[in-house]
């Protein structure tokens, strides 16, 4: 599908939830600053849309980009419906497995997605697509993120990924130092375009900077945070569980001054 750079070029949006597919970024050659973009870390995990159904609050579907339901493979996310403060919702994020430094473990994630035993999986949520039966795909990104922070209660396996406005180069430098795979840059006023690979979202790869083990060893979720973020639904004040504690600890080492 061709790029969609404005609402006027936006295709007719599918009815939720059956035919919804993730919006995809285009690559960017280098890090950049922009007052029009929100920047957030990306671990390069498995993109998954989570559907919390209105008819049965205990029912959860986790659909990958091919429409395959992964919910039975990830039982640690069974409590996600209880963490959504709404009758129903659809959220977008990535499934990841990380090591004790917070770096992605693609082999561990692959094992879990094949139904094999393996380390715990975390769901890193960064967008809200529908709330209480109402699609909000046309709402600007910053508004969807505001609603996400009010709606999602983080847990042992769920984190709401923070973003920073404007300072993409600084975040990219920090992400490289911490061994995270990429930075996702999204136009803060952008709608959500299901199934579209759009320049409204750009992915900047971040080849890790090799550092001594001491730079990453001993990262603990209970450590001192430099973020200055309120406990507003991002989960950054929480200690997390086995799947999310290393992620939270690593996020605390990134240059987030406020929630965008």
What are the residue ranges of the model-derived segments?
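Catalytic cores of nucleic-acid ligases and guanylyltransferases
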Residues: 1-260
């Amino acid at each position: 599908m061709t790029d969609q750079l404005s609402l006027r070029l936006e295709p007719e949006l599918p009815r939720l939830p059956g035919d919804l597919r993730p919006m995809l970024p285009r690559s960017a050659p280098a890090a950049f600053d922009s007052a029009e973009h929100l920047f957030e870390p990306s671990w390069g995990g498995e993109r998954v849309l989570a559907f919390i159904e209105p008819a049965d609050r205990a029912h959860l579907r986790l659909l990958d980009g091919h429409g395959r339901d992964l919910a039975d493979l990830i039982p640690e996310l069974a409590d996600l419906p209880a963490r959504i403060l709404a009758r129903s919702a659809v959220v977008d994020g990535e499934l990841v497995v990380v090591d004790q430094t917070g770096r992605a473990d693609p082999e561990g994630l692959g094992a879990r997605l094949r139904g094999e035993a393996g380390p715990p999986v975390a769901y890193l949520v960064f967008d809200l697509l529908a709330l209480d039966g109402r699609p909000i795909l046309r709402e600007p990104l910053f508004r969807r993120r505001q609603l996400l922070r009010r709606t999602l209660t983080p847990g042992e396996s769920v984190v709401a990924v923070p973003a920073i406005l404007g300072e993409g180069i600084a975040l990219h430098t920090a992400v490289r130092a911490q061994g995270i795979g990429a930075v996702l840059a999204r136009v803060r006023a952008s709608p959500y375009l299901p199934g579209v690979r759009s320049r409204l979202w750009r992915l900047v790869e971040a080849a890790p900077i090799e550092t001594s083990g001491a730079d990453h060893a001993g990262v603990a979720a209970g450590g001192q945070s430099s973020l200055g973020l309120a406990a507003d639904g991002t989960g950054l004040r929480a200690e997390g569980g086995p799947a999310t504690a290393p992620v939270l600890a690593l996020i605390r080492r990134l240059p987030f001054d406020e929630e965008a």
